[in-house]
Amino acid sequence: MRPFLMILSVTYIASAESPAKTHVRHHNRYHSHSPLKSNLRKTYNSPRLDKPLSDIGITDARRVPPVYISGNSSPLVADVGPDSGESGVVLAPSIDGSSEGNIGIYVSPSRDGQGIGSRERLISLHHLIHHAQGEALKASAISSAAKLEASALLAQRQELNAKIMANRAAMLQEEEQRLVAQRSSNPLILVKDTVPVANVANNNLSFEHHNELLNKKLDMIKKDQDEAIKRAENLARLHKARTQILPDSLVASDPKQFKDFVDGGPAQDLTFEVPVDPSIGNYYVSSDPGENLQTNKAPLTTGDLPYFIAHSNENGVFSPYGSLSNGESVAQA
């Protein structure tokens, strides 16, 4: 697994370094700290961090691709692989893998044991969020550009259809005039001179052929658009266009915790879009959910994942007016 992670890290250097430099320039006032020096080869023997995700109750988890910031020798986010110890973020749609119930965003500890509260780590997480949001904006831009191109082609097709209809009308009118002229010259003989009609018909076939080509091009654009958006969405792991969870909708076991996290880095306007549909229930943040986040099947985490953003509907762990371990009421989202 480690050789694969190293290969994966090298693969992403070229593709992610340029956007990363943009992030660094945009937020240079937050970069007085030294760059991270964590190494994926370093062994960090912690029985809690070496557990498979399924052993801590995380099933059907999405893996986040590596994200590089200029000056860092290792990615901010590495493929989680078989254990939860890599530096990164894991999305799990639910505790038991179903499409409904509890879901969460997990921010796992650094592989070298660096705490989540350090300045460098916090800034790294903010950059990760910006990266994911940027990928979502890229997907939106791709979609908008494709729609504009498709609209222009649709206008051309409408114009062609109008010409085709006018051409058919002219063909029928010419046919009628020719027949009337033939009858007038010799009512007993009806000679069908097909040359004029053939000329108009050929023009009509040319229009229809062009229209067919336009339809094929539109189909290709739609296919390319769908593929491009799918690729972009696969990168935007933290930014799913279903349910928006705003910071004001979050309740923390420590009320200042999430606010401190937001205020501590450059991403001041955080919006987490989590795949919950429909979006009913509770949202909360906790640094140590512990036994509060468990179902009848398995505990969600043993507390080794410092930040957790969860959603619970009425069928989940909490009722709409449940409470956390410290007795604070959880507002319904």
Curated annotation (Swiss-Prot):
UniProt keyword annotation of Glycoprotein present: yes
Q: Which residues are glycosylated?
A: 204
Signal: is it a keyword of this entry?
yes
- The signal peptide stretch is 1-16
Top-rank taxon? Eukaryota
Q: Which UniProt keywords apply?
A: Glycoprotein, Signal
Q: How is this protein named in the record? A: Uncharacterized protein ECU05_0110
Source organism: Encephalitozoon cuniculi (strain GB-M1)
Organism lineage string: Eukaryota, Fungi, Fungi incertae sedis, Microsporidia, Unikaryonidae
